[in-house]
């Protein structure tokens, strides 16, 4: 941060404000404190019969890679509204959300991913401005090596795992970097068991 958005001063530096426990951007001229919080990404796992709707990205990062429709929440909308909007924008698809499915924390990049299971109302879809193409895939046809983000790969794996078990869960976890590798750690209760909610 180079300038204070409150007074325009360039006397902005990181400091621990009084009563706080971590460094924030603080203006040395007017004293304004700037809090930067994680961004929320909301999206859908759209299902049509035994197929999943994927979008090929038309933008960086991961241009040309496959993903589920998802994106940043806008001010003034709910999580579900954001997920439905992103699906409409990226895949021109109409969905009906059925359940909250995954919540992933990515502290390294200050993001929270929230994905919903959703039913395609009808199999009508087309690439939006952020997609090169959209396609329905059965599990064995999914281009696993070309999935854009680990959060999307894990969401898809949880879906097919739950589908085999015959019931769906809410999955909560953290994506952390360990020894140079990004790993997914499930959220655990105090007794060490994984936090899941079945329906």
Functional labels for PLM-detected ranges:
Residues 1-43:
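Acidic, metal-coordinating catalytic segment for phosphate/diphosphate chemistry
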Residues 29, 57, 70, 118, ...:
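Active-site donor-binding loop signature of nucleotide-sugar glycosyltransferases
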Residues 47-85, 89:
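Conserved Nudix-box catalytic region and its N-terminal flanking loop in Nudix hydrolases
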Residues 2-6, 178-179, 189-196:
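Small, basic N-terminal interaction modules of short regulatory proteins
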Residues 22, 39-41, 47, 61-63, ...:
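Short connector loops at helix/strand junctions that flank enzyme active sites
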Residues 3, 24, 45, 54, ...:
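Conserved hydrophobic/aromatic beta-strand scaffold that supports enzyme active sites
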Residues 170-186:
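A short, charged, Gly/Pro-tolerant segment at domain boundaries
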Residues 73-158, 162-167, 183-199:
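Unchanged
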């Amino acid at each position: 941060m180079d300038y204070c958005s409150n007074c325009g001063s360039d006397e902005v530096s990181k400091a621990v404000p009084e009563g706080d426990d971590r460094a924030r951007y603080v203006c040395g001229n007017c004293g304004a404190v700037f809090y930067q919080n994680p961004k929320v990404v909301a999206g859908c796992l759209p299902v049509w019969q035994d197929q999943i709707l994927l979008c090929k990205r038309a933008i960086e990062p991961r241009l040309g890679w496959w993903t589920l429709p998802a994106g940043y929440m806008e001010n003034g909308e709910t999580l579900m509204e954001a997920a439905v909007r992103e699906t409409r924008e990226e895949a021109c698809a109409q969905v009906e959300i059925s359940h909250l499915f995954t919540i992933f924390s990515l502290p390294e990049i200050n993001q929270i991913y929230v994905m919903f299971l959703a039913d395609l109302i009808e199999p009508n879809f087309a690439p939006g401005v952020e997609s090169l193409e959209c396609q329905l895939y059965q599990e064995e046809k999914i281009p696993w090596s070309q999935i854009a983000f680990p959060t999307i790969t894990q969401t898809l794996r949880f879906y097919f795992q739950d589908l085999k078990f015959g019931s769906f869960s809410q999955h909560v976890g953290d994506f952390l970097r360990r020894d140079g590798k990004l790993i997914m750690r499930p959220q655990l209760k105090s007794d060490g068991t994984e936090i899941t909610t079945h329906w």
